[in-house]
């Protein structure tokens, strides 16, 4: 068992429970009893504003901020539970609904079948099996956000993330082969060998810049078609039930307008087909994430095919700086902060001088082409106070952040509006 020893001689072993104070960073050995924050209880709807002096002050300030802010505040939510919580916290819609989790768990087998399909019939069977499951997910999320916009990002990660690890699978098959040859063990199945071939084929040296997002949708067009149909059918079902779904379809990792045009054409055809089949037409916006630097620099062209932009500032920061976030944060960020390369991680607070310029260029050129273009941000920066102020001044329409950061974003959006008004008056 792996262990470490603290300065006072305490030994901590693998599996021991630790508690961490999220404010101070102090670590406690064992499980520390906790009680819900009264402020969180207030936002959850379990505590009235006049029940606690602190809560009363928070209520007063947040209401004042809401009355002053120009920026809308949405949330990043992938489930109906997260969506409902965000709504209680004051979220005005979902700015990012990731669909990746809808392909995990028991559904992973269908993705494997899709990848291993040897013909159109097998591929269609795998997609048909996923359709009702996706539709149920969207019915739940659209229902939780009834009357508010829900921006659904079509599948973004590379397919290999839904497959077994290359090294582990290779070792497993090599061991099985050796046992079969030496001791007459069970032979490796054709399915496992086909799976290994697929994992090798899809393995990438730098998957963040590889076959993902819109590129995946163009290589396997049925995948995006499945998701668009599930969105349309879910919205039609809810509308028949008297609800008011407001879906928005967001295409990830677009770098050229031609990519978006191809996906948009197919999406519009599917939306029209579902409207004809169900007798229900649901107005659905189609837009894109701006997360590739080239997309920001050619935003005027991309706006010709997009009804909205949403900045994916996590990936935009990675590509703009040339950072691989998973590698660099632990490798040298603390040193960069110590020597003053930057004062805070650019993944926590937006780099206004560099990445911020890309944002401003995209806003200006996008709206020059399409004045009604709706623009938001759905990266983690959407809940960062300093970044929220930048987005206000850059002219964005809304920010989107995790449910628990929604109150912070509401407050900072109000402060940004007041500061801007004070500056204008001077």
Residue ranges of predicted features:
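Short, Lys/Arg- and Gly-enriched loop/turn segments at beta-strand edges
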Residues: 24-33
């Amino acid at each position: 068992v792996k262990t470490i020893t603290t300065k006072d001689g305490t030994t901590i072993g693998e599996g021991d429970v630790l508690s961490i104070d999220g404010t101070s960073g102090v670590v406690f050995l064992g499980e520390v009893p906790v009680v819900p924050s009264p402020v969180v209880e207030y936002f959850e709807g379990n505590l009235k504003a006049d029940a606690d002096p602190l809560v009363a002050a928070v209520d007063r300030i947040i209401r004042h901020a809401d009355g002053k802010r120009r920026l809308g505040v949405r949330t990043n939510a992938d489930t109906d539970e997260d969506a409902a919580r965000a709504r209680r916290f004051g979220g005005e819609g979902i700015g990012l609904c990731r669909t990746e989790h809808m392909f995990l768990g028991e559904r992973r087998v269908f993705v494997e079948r899709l990848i291993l399909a040897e013909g159109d019939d097998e591929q269609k069977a795998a997609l048909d099996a996923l359709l009702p499951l996706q539709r149920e997910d969207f019915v739940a999320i659209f229902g939780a956000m009834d009357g508010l916009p829900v921006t659904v990002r079509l599948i973004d990660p590379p397919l290999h993330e839904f497959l077994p690890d290359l090294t582990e699978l290779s070792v497993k098959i090599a061991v099985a082969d050796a046992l079969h040859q030496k001791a007459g063990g069970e032979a490796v199945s054709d399915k496992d060998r086909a799976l290994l071939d697929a994992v090798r084929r899809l393995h990438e040296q730098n998957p963040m810049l590889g076959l993902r997002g819109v590129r995946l949708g163009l290589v396997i067009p049925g995948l995006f078609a499945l998701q668009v149909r599930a969105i349309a059918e879910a919205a039609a079902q809810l509308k028949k039930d008297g609800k008011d779904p407001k879906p928005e379809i967001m295409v990830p990792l677009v770098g050229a307008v031609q990519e978006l045009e191809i996906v948009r054409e197919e999406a519009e055809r599917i939306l029209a087909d579902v409207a004809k089949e169900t007798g229900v037409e649901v107005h659905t916006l189609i837009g894109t994430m701006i997360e590739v630097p080239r997309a920001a620099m050619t935003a005027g062209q991309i706006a010709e095919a997009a009804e909205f932009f949403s900045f994916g500032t996590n990936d935009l920061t990675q590509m703009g700086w040339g950072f691989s976030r998973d590698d660099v944060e632990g490798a040298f960020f603390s040193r960069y902060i110590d020597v003053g390369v930057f004062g805070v991680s650019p993944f926590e607070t937006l780099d206004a001088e560099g990445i911020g310029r890309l944002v401003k260029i995209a806003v200006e050129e996008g709206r020059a082409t399409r004045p009604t273009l709706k623009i938001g941000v759905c990266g983690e920066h959407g809940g960062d106070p300093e970044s929220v102020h930048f987005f206000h001044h850059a002219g964005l329409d809304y920010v989107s952040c995790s449910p628990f950061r929604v109150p912070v974003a509401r407050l900072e959006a109000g402060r940004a509006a007041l500061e801007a008004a004070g500056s204008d008056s001077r």
